[in-house]
Regions:
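Conserved acetyl-CoA-binding loop-helix of GNAT-fold acetyltransferases
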Residues: 88-89, 95-109, 127-135
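GNAT-family acyltransferases
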Residues: 1-84, 92, 109, 150-173
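Conserved catalytic-core motifs of GNAT/GCN5-like acyltransferases
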Residues: 121, 139-158
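Conserved GNAT acetyl-CoA-binding A-motif
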Residues: 110-122
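Residue-level recognition of the GNAT/N-acetyltransferase active site
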Residues: 86, 90, 121-123
Length: 173
């Protein structure tokens, strides 16, 4: 069963393999990261871990039984009890409820980071992401600037987190 794990240095190679294997798939929904991202991946990964240690973000990877990365789920711009959620899942597990289960779990974990509100933006043509957010309790909160989602028109979604959230049960995953 996949496990959501806090990002650490030891995940670097599996995350890079995940990003490379799914590059074309991700580019259908968001802007491509460009060759420079992959060429400088090690530096980027280290910088992300430094930001995480400083409390600016909280990054997680969904790890499969074979230790491969099935998805990335991140809380960015953490401040004043609010964070921006970003996520992506491997094409091979898309449409199987993996993203929904992980986003729900991350909503539970967000309280550990002192968060009360999560926001996420998705393009109008990314219906799957809209469904994930809706199933995880997010509601539309207004238009997203195309600069926030790779030049596409979209919507911001928001979820207010309740105190004492319980982790999702097996039937909710």
């Amino acid at each position: 069963m996949p496990e959501l794990q806090r990002l650490r240095a030891g995940h670097a190679q599996a995350v890079l393999a995940f990003e490379l294997a799914n590059r074309a798939y991700f580019a259908m929904f968001i802007s491509d990261r460009g060759d420079e991202f992959f060429d400088q991946f090690t530096e980027w990964h280290i910088a992300l871990l430094v930001e995480q240690e400083a409390g600016l973000c909280a990054c997680y990877v969904l790890v499969g039984d074979d230790d491969s990365v099935l998805g990335r789920f991140n809380l960015f711009d953490i401040r004043d009890g609010t964070a921006v959620l970003g996520y992506r899942v491997a094409e091979r597990v898309a449409g199987r409820g993996v993203a929904t289960a992980a986003v729900r779990e991350l909503c539970q974990l967000a309280a550990q980071h002192g968060l009360r509100t999560l926001k996420a933006a998705t393009s109008h043509d990314n219906v799957a992401s809209q469904r994930v957010l809706a199933k995880a309790g997010f509601r539309p909160a207004g238009p997203a600037d195309p600069a926030d989602i790779g030049g596409k028109q979209g919507t911001w979604y928001q979820r207010e987190l309740a105190a004492g959230l319980r982790p999702p049960g097996p039937s909710e995953r």
